[in-house]
Amino acid sequence: MEWSLTQNKLLAFHRLMRTDKPIGALLLLWPTLWALWVATPGVPQLWILAVFVAGVWLMRAAGCVVNDYADRKFDGHVKRTANRPLPSGAVTEKEARALFVVLVLISFLLVLTLNTMTILLSIAALALAWVYPFMKRYTHLPQVVLGAAFGWSIPMAFAAVSESVPLSCWLMFLANILWAVAYDTQYAMVDRDDDVKIGIKSTAILFGQYDKLIIGILQIGVLALMAIIGELNGLGWGYYWSILVAGALFVYQQKLIANREREACFKAFMNNNYVGLVLFLGLAMSYWHF
């Protein structure tokens, strides 16, 4: 196979990896930083931090590639995705597969600089990243798999720091799954009508008229679990204030999705970046005694 790395091809790879849309990487980054700050506590080693930040961006890019590869026959039928690089022909299937392999190999080379437990956990991370895009064909709960995939950096972070995965690790992992199901349901509400027509499954379709209620319950669960983590680790008031601010952001999201309008649902999804940021700032302030 010969690659013609013209400017147009590089731009197509750029779009395929979603490096022009950082929201997905940020939603993966914040829980990773939560885990590193709790595990250390508050002062992660610079190399470990660098490996995980780079890994977040690389694996998110790889996840986007495999997601579009899995959906290549569906995306052409959805208005929002019809012009993506694979359905439009800007990137071939062989090129997409090769790009995925390159991104995964670079990520794995970074992980090899960490301890054995983290390396072993990274195998599960790869499996989750590969499996998730295909789940929407077989189950209405692909968002749960997404949450596990996006949250697997949490046990990896704890393992990298202490070679252990304590209770706080798994509570944070569960909180991330609940959060991911909530925000990705908001995202799926944007495409719900198109997904029904082409046979794609999602929690937005499964929850139906109860979507807003269930999202709200999931968001309350996130806040409760994060509060328990704070109690287990003796975190200060700065952290609990961040939980209150995150709760206010969740209320704002409920207001946005009230009428289930596409643009408003997408705006609610995007707002979750601030939830992750606020919780991270709360952790940082607590550990750094601001």
Curated annotation (Swiss-Prot):
Coiled-coil region(s): none
Location of the protein in the cell: Cell inner membrane
Description of pH dependence: Optimum pH is 7.8.
Residue ranges, Periplasmic side: 1-22, 67-99, 162, 289-290
Transmembrane segment boundaries: 23-43, 46-66, 100-119, 141-161, 163-183, 213-233, 234-254, 268-288
Chemical reaction(s) catalysed: all-trans-octaprenyl diphosphate + 4-hydroxybenzoate = 4-hydroxy-3-(all-trans-octaprenyl)benzoate + diphosphate
UniProt-listed Enzyme Commission number(s): 2.5.1.39
MF annotations from Gene Ontology: 4-hydroxybenzoate polyprenyltransferase activity; transferase activity, transferring alkyl or aryl (other than methyl) groups
Cofactor list: Mg(2+)
tRNA processing keyword on record: no
Cellular component GO terms held in the UniProt record: plasma membrane
Cofactor binding: number and manner: Can also use Mn(2+) and Co(2+) with lower efficiency.
Loss of function: phenotype: Mutant is unable to convert 4-hydroxybenzoate into 3-octaprenyl-4-hydroxybenzoate and is ubiquinone-deficient.
Induction: Expression is slightly repressed by glucose.
Involved pathway(s): Cofactor biosynthesis; ubiquinone biosynthesis
UniProt topological domain (Cytoplasmic) ranges: 44-45, 120-140, 184-212, 255-267
Similarity remark: Belongs to the UbiA prenyltransferase family.
Note: The sdgG mutation, which suppresses a conditional mutation in dnaG (DNA primase), has been localized to one of the ubiA, ubiC or yjbI genes.
Function: Catalyzes the prenylation of para-hydroxybenzoate (PHB) with an all-trans polyprenyl group. Mediates the second step in the final reaction sequence of ubiquinone-8 (UQ-8) biosynthesis, which is the condensation of the polyisoprenoid side chain with PHB, generating the first membrane-bound Q intermediate 3-octaprenyl-4-hydroxybenzoate. Geranyldiphosphate (GPP), all-trans-farnesyldiphosphate (FPP) and all-trans-solanesyldiphosphate (SPP) are also accepted as side chain precursors.
UniProt name for this protein: 4-hydroxybenzoate octaprenyltransferase
Lineage: Bacteria, Pseudomonadati, Pseudomonadota, Gammaproteobacteria, Enterobacterales
Encoding gene per record: ubiA
